[in-house]
From Swiss-Prot:
Gene3D superfamilies: Aldolase class I. One of its GO terms (biological process) is L-histidine biosynthetic process. IGPS catalyzes the conversion of PRFAR and glutamine to IGP, AICAR and glutamate. The HisF subunit catalyzes the cyclization activity that produces IGP and AICAR from PRFAR using the ammonia provided by the HisH subunit. Heterodimer of HisH and HisF. InterPro entries: Aldolase_TIM (IPR013785), His_biosynth (IPR006062), HisF (IPR004651), IGPS_HisA/HisF (IPR050064), RibuloseP-bd_barrel (IPR011060). GO terms for molecular function: imidazoleglycerol-phosphate synthase activity; lyase activity. Pathway: Amino-acid biosynthesis; L-histidine biosynthesis; L-histidine from 5-phospho-alpha-D-ribose 1-diphosphate: step 5/9. It holds the Pfam family His_biosynth. It comes from Shewanella baltica (strain OS185). Belongs to the HisA/HisF family. Its EC number is 4.3.2.10. This is Imidazole glycerol phosphate synthase subunit HisF. The active site is at 11, 130. It is found in: Cytoplasm.
Length: 257
């Protein structure tokens, strides 16, 4: 059995790490490089950095801090934000990122997924999916440009259909960002993650809702995800990564120590 991964997420805006609730009202929580170094020291398995306004503002993630992070940490990290071309992806990988993640640009141009996979291999192509439960239609729908509240828009895609589409096009991993749960620390959306797990043949990373150590245990056991991503519980030192790993190991979950 492959060990489960713990992945702190750092949302970046204007050169600072920020955190919102349900993708709104972002507040500054710290500086990029010191936070990255802290999580690596605590035992994070990898890190994810989202430049949350890059796509909405028609720009690419700032490479200057990517190289500084690469110099400071010795664990893999993934970078996302406005990546729309092979050359942009190549540059970020050259600056030290191990993986690149695309979200809104893939919705605009799904062929980008297969082109990136052909160039770099599927192992470093991650697809982020911002999924919103629409109570009116009782369905899960994909949203786009979610890093800027004013720019956020609905797409034509139901979440399960988009999950299948991105796999056909060659993604190596999927991060499912459950918008309704984001930042509220009420637990991961086990129901939705389980539905996606059933149709997902690539590694699936749960995102949105972590509030206690038990939430991590539950998402690994019940939704059978490969990794759990979290932000506010780590930023605010509610949960220490080393202590979380000890807890999960004691609960019988295979975890990297």
């Amino acid at each position: 059995m492959l060990a489960k991964r713990l992945v702190p997420c750092l949302d970046v805006k204007d050169g600072k790490v920020v955190k919102g609730v349900q993708f709104r009202n972002h507040e500054i929580v710290g500086d990029i490089v010191p936070l990255a170094a802290r999580y690596a020291e605590e035992g994070a398995d990898e890190l994810v950095f989202y430049d949350i306004t890059a796509s909405a503002h028609e720009r690419v993630v700032d490479k200057s801090w990517v190289s500084r992070v690469a110099e400071q940490i010795d664990i893999p990290f993934c970078v996302a934000g406005g990546i729309k071309t092979i050359s942009q992806a190549r540059e970020l990988l050259a600056f030290g990122a191990d993986k690149i993640s695309i979200n809104s640009p893939a919705l605009t141009d799904p062929s980008l997924i297969s082109r990136l996979q052909d160039e770099f291999g599927r192992q470093c192509i991650v697809i982020g999916i911002d999924s919103f439960f629409d109570a009116t239609s009782n369905s899960y729908k994909v949203k786009q440009f979610t890093g800027d509240e004013a720019a956020t828009k609905d797409t034509q895609w139901f979440t399960q259909d988009w999950v299948e589409e991105v796999q056909k096009r060659g993604c190596g991993e999927i991060v499912l960002n459950v918008m309704n749960q984001d930042g509220v620390r009420g637990g991961y959306d086990i129901k939705q993650l389980s539905l996606v797990r059933a149709i997902c043949d690539v590694p699936l990373i749960a995102s949105g809702g972590a509030g206690t150590m038990a939430h991590f245990r539950d998402v690994f056991i019940e939704a059978k995800v490969d990794a759990a991503l979290a932000a506010s519980v780590f930023h605010k030192a509610i949960i220490n990564i080393g202590e979380l790993k000890a807890y999960l190991a004691a609960e019988g979950i295979a975890i990297r120590r």
